[in-house]
């Protein structure tokens, strides 16, 4: 954890927190997904381990890049360090468009759709099709 400086919390969900961080060695901006596993069932812990292992193996331009993971056994917390997508997520994009009474252009919609399909094809063909996302929603589609 001494390799990173926390900048701010940028997300919160049932899984835990997402924090914007800066890697000390090169100043690169990344994020970490912070998950406390102390109250997880054995099955949930296994899913967490599987998620980390899958992220480590996936390498595709439309899948958020995995960099590292830190396990803090004392705090029962796992930190998954990943690429930062500065454009936010599609859920936020939709909310902002609704608020300003604007539309997302068809061209942008098709571009995002094609990238999501490309990422899903990669996931579904990885290790004989054993990788399923299980939570595809606008808030989980990030924009760089």
Give, region by region, the residue ranges found by the protein language model.
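Protein kinase glycine-rich loop
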Residues: 7-13, 18
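Glycine-rich ATP phosphate-binding loop
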Residues: 17-37
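Regulatory alphaC helix of protein kinase catalytic domains
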Residues: 48, 52-53
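A short, aromatic-enriched beta-strand patch in the conserved N-lobe beta-sheet
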Residues: 68-70
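Conserved short submotifs of the Hanks-type protein kinase catalytic core
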Residues: 75-89, 93
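AlphaC helix of the protein kinase catalytic domain
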Residues: 91-103
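Activation segment signature within eukaryotic-like protein kinase domains
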Residues: 112-113
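Catalytic-loop of the protein kinase fold
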Residues: 124-143
